[in-house]
From Swiss-Prot:
Tree of life domain: Eukaryota
Taxonomic classification: Eukaryota, Metazoa, Porifera, Demospongiae, Heteroscleromorpha
Biased composition (Basic and acidic residues): 212-226
Gene Ontology MF, one: structural constituent of ribosome
Name used for this protein in its record: Small ribosomal subunit protein uS2
Job description of the protein: Required for the assembly and/or stability of the 40S ribosomal subunit. Required for the processing of the 20S rRNA-precursor to mature 18S rRNA in a late step of the maturation of 40S ribosomal subunits.
Single biological process term from Gene Ontology: translation
Location within or outside the cell: Cytoplasm
Key word Cytoplasm present: yes
Entries under InterPro entries matching the protein: Ribosomal_uS2 (IPR001865), Ribosomal_uS2_C (IPR032281), Ribosomal_uS2_CS (IPR018130), Ribosomal_uS2_euk (IPR027498), Ribosomal_uS2_euk/arc (IPR005707), Ribosomal_uS2_flav_dom_sf (IPR023591)
Family matches, as PROSITE patterns: RIBOSOMAL_S2_1 (PS00962), RIBOSOMAL_S2_2 (PS00963)
Low complexity composition-biased segments: 234-247, 261-289
Keywords: Cytoplasm, Ribonucleoprotein, Ribosomal protein
Length: 325
């Protein structure tokens, strides 16, 4: 289908994405109607889907979706958890109506119930697990587009897109490619520029992993806020001018440490400056502080410890006792 137009041909980047996601790997069981999409079988019995036929069916499905005037008349459905996030993203960008999770029987056939809808086109993620909406769509003549694996039955399916719909990366990539092609056919995005939306947004994510990532981000944010608050509350060290510091310590600015501070007496108005006295007043003990007399030479002569009035130790004789013991 896309061999005649260069614009619709499959690019190398698209082939790399399909092979990296494992879209070409089918199920070990092959339905007789899906055998036409199998390229060959590996030695371990796994069939390999022809990627070129996958791309051609993808373009056909995108043309069918773009032909619907009202995007809300397109219903996308996924019963498996792997495709629920993908259909929600597809509905967000294309304007389709999503049904994620369990399909309520009678949604397309029972007009009494509140959830009754009449879509013009139905797109399902798995032809085997979504058999109930496919059957109801056949009752009311709603065309069906389905992502089919090699073991999927093709009954009541109008456009089958062969791919690996069992892997979360493969199914998310197929929804991303279909969404991009629909937007290109509508003229919303250009073919010359890459789409800014990454395929990772269409991939399934485990709720437990998402919760752990959110907790880790919240913990990191709390630590960052605590660090910023601690740094904000710390007072800055006062920076004092060196000249002011020298004045408070009694050291002249720009002088040596050994120089004594010079104090200038105030000059009385209208007279000569006072003459400083040249006679030094001896320091006296005022009861506290330094006393010069403590360091002066004593005026009285003191005796040695061993000296006696009688002379040396050896020349002294004991005095005779004058009385009895």
């Amino acid at each position: 289908m896309s061999g005649g137009l260069e614009v619709l041909s499959m690019k190398e980047d698209d082939v790399t994405k399909l092979l990296a996601a494992g879209t070409h790997l089918g199920d070990s069981n092959v339905d007789i109607q899906m055998a036409q999409y199998v390229f060959k079988t590996k030695g371990d019995g796994v069939p390999i889907i022809n990627v070129r036929k996958t791309w051609e069916k993808l373009l056909l499905a995108a043309r069918v979706i773009a032909a619907i005037e009202n995007p809300a008349d397109v219903c996308v459905l996924a019963n498996k958890p792997f495709g629920q996030r993908a259909i929600l993203k597809f509905a967000h960008y294309t304007g389709a109506f999503p049904i994620a999770g369990r399909f309520t029987p009678g949604t397309f056939t029972n007009q009494i119930q509140k959830a009754f809808r009449e879509p013009r086109l139905l797109i399902v993620s798995d032809a085997r697990s979504d058999h109930q909406p496919i059957t109801e769509a056949a009752y009311v003549n709603i065309p069906v587009i389905a992502f089919c694996n090699t073991n999927s039955p093709l009954r009541y399916i109008d456009v089958a897109i062969p791919c690996n719909n069992m892997g979360k990366n493969s199914l998310g990539l197929m929804w991303w490619l279909l969404c991009r092609e629909v937007l290109r056919l509508r003229g919303t995005i250009s073919r010359e520029l890459p789409w800014e939306v990454m395929p990772d947004l269409f991939f399934y994510r485990d709720p437990e992993e998402v919760e752990k990532e959110e907790q880790a981000k919240a913990e990191a944010e709390r630590e960052r806020l605590a660090t910023d608050q601690w740094q904000t509350n710390q007072p800055a060290a006062p920076q004092q001018d060196p000249d002011q510091w020298a004045d408070t310590m009694g050291v002249p600015s720009g002088g040596d440490w050994g120089d004594e501070p010079v104090t200038t007496a105030p000059v009385p108005t209208g007279g000569a400056p006072p003459v400083a006295s040249t006679t030094a007043t001896p320091a006296t003990n005022t009861g506290s502080g330094f006393n010069q007399d403590d360091w002066s030479v004593p005026t009285t002569k003191t005796k040695d410890w061993g000296a006696d009035d009688g002379g040396e130790w050896g020349n002294t004789e004991p005095k005779a006792s004058t009385g009895n013991w």
